[in-house]
Amino acid sequence: MRGNGDMLARCWEERDLGALLAQRFGMFAMEELAEELERKYDDVIRLTLGQSELPVHPDITEAMVAAARDPRRSRLVYPLGVPALREAVADYETQASGRHVDPASVVVSAGSSTLIRNLCCLLAHDGGEVLLPRPYYPLYLYSAALAGARVNFYDIDLVTGCIDFASLREALNGDTRMVILNSPGNPLGNRLTMADLRQVDEAVDGRAVIVSDEIYRNMSFDDVAPSMGALNDPRSPIVVTNSFSAGLRMFARRVGYAVVPGELTPALTTLQAHTLLTTDPVPQYGAIEALRHLEEAEAIRMLYAGRRDYAVKRLGEVAGVRPIRAEGSFYLTIDVASRLGDGESDRTLAESILSAAHVATVPGSDFGLPGTLRLTYAASRFDEAIDRVAAFFEERV
């Protein structure tokens, strides 16, 4: 767990894939430490994985059980996804964007992570550049590295949650092949407006493909998070990715999708066929049922908005701790840079909190944001966990 908060970025800049792969994802390292502590104590609370503590809707479970028992459906092999799910997703995205989405443009995969990796391979395999938000979800960095792409960054303002468009325009260049957006974002929970999306498209101006990761789109707390797919007459090719893991709580079932321009579909189909072959049809039938229960996402959105409010208020009362108010997603980031001791990193601080308060958090250095911690709302004893974290800092000399 030791290491410099900028280690991932430094490994990338040095083009050292081996060193990059040697850097463990702090989230899973903290999960393992929490699991070890749970063997001794029964009061450990994990604020690590963005995996809702609420169960999957019973109708979704029943749909998967029925599909598993039906050999005609459980053995289906479709590299692009079961046709019925592609049609259901097209209807859903048509409603979300207000623009017709053809089922032929929908590519289903085992979660959206595999799609982002394959899109990096497809678009930037020749050493082209992938432009990422900073802070970033580490999947983006690793996907680009595995594709042999180069990485550049644009910044998200930590106070406003808005894109620093000057940094975006400065980072764009003739080698840029792909620009990744994430709204609401992970780890900040920042939300982009339609005006923001339009300004991104104008800045890119057709020079690269814009990939909009909208996995938390239905987890926007205070206002609607618009889809990039709703943009009228975009100048740039647009890919929208989404997943059933968050609001619809199919976290471990691994079903995601992308809506892609027609010219990318054949090549992406080939990549999917050779790197994945197929997505398990059983959870795909669960996903079809999930799209009939969108109220599930609304219920969890309201629950997590309340938890966000409590955490911002309670942690905001602690000297030297600054909650960065999230507008959506499953996560809240807190700035603790001024509370780090000499030689202490956010990783060692997270270990100390786990040891003393029995609350597992994720070091922000994993996301290119050293000096912070990421907390997930997805814990039934969330308020208690926040009180413990606050007490840890209040009692710390």
Feature map (PLM): residue ranges:
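N-terminal small-domain helix-loop-helix segment of the aminotransferase-like
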Residues: 2-111, 118, 396-397
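Conserved core of the PLP fold type I
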Residues: 69, 73-202, 218-232, 239, ...
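PLP-dependent enzyme catalytic core of the Aspartate aminotransferase-like
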Residues: 91, 169, 342-344, 351-361, ...
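Residue-level recognition of strand-loop junctions within catalytic nucleotide-signaling folds
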Residues: 261-262, 292, 335-337, 378-380
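Conserved PLP-binding catalytic core of the aspartate aminotransferase-like
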Residues: 304-305, 320-356, 373, 379
